[in-house]
A protein has these predicted regions:
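Conserved two-metal-ion catalytic palm core of "right-hand" nucleic acid polymerases
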Residues: 1-203
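Active-site palm subdomain of RNA-directed nucleic acid polymerases
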Residues: 200-239
Length: 239
């Protein structure tokens, strides 16, 4: 239950909030898994997100979200129980620079392999050493545009997921259900802020990276890496 404990105690609030907002006491939930009443782990109850916009560069704003603690605990428990399967799917891409890493200490429970845009500088330099151009693309409203029903598509393929859409033996269906329950049943978008969303989004984006890699030779273009973060996904292709 270590991942459940860490996601609750150090991955609940958005990182933009000051340190005075602390959820370290929520780690106790991980020790109460078996003692908690069945209603706590309900798979049918829904809750609403608490949302707040913070300014970004220019005129843009980032819509942060704080989920109901019970709904978030359900999602984190699913990630914890199924981490081996999630990790196996994430590892399919050899070019992603955003693979989520769990940390036992520090301010956050989960960080991407390259946590900050500034840390991409050496990677860009390496890409330039073998080519002339870096192609960069920005995915607008990335988290907000993820369709929760597409989470099982990414994990199990769209064909399988549609054939077994009510089969909760599939991890993707359980994650989809937890995400919807956490945001009043809505299927469009996942909350920006909690560390669990980083795990879900990277798992979802993994198929895109694999598809790019499979088609990475188009004429003189060779894809060397994909490094998405919240709201931006630069793709590096030396020509």
């Amino acid at each position: 239950m270590r991942k459940l404990r860490d996601l609750l105690s150090r991955g609940y609030f958005p990182r933009e909030l000051p340190p005075v907002y602390d959820t370290s006491s929520m780690r106790r939930v991980a020790t109460m898994v078996n003692a908690a009443p069945a209603s706590f782990w309900s798979t049918t109850r829904t809750s609403e997100l608490c949302q707040h916009n913070v300014p970004r560069s220019g005129t843009l704003r980032r819509p942060l979200a704080i989920p109901n603690p019970v709904g978030y605990a359900n999602l984190c428990r699913e990630i914890d129980n199924s981490w081996r399967e999630i990790s196996r799917h994430i590892s399919k891409s050899a070019i992603s620079k955003s693979t989520p890493q769990f940390y036992t200490a520090g301010a956050r429970a989960v960080l991407p392999e390259i946590p900050n845009q500034a840390d991409l500088v050496p990677f860009r330099a390496l890409a330039r050493s073998s080519g002339k151009t870096i192609l960069s693309t920005d995915i607008s409203r990335f988290y907000g545009s993820i369709y929760t029903h597409s989470v099982p598509w990414a994990l199990h393929t769209k064909v399988v997921a549609k054939q077994r859409r009510r089969d909760y033996g599939l991890l993707g269906n359980r994650l989809d259900r937890s995400l919807r329950n956490m945001q009043d049943g809505q299927t469009m978008g996942i909350p920006i802020g909690p560390d669990a969303s980083l795990v879900i989004s990277d798992d979802w984006l993994r198929n895109l990276g694999v598809s790019f890699y499979d088609d990475s030779m188009v004429g003189p273009v060779k894809l060397t890496g994909i490094a998405p973060s919240i709201g931006v996904a630069p793709i590096f292709s030396p020509l």
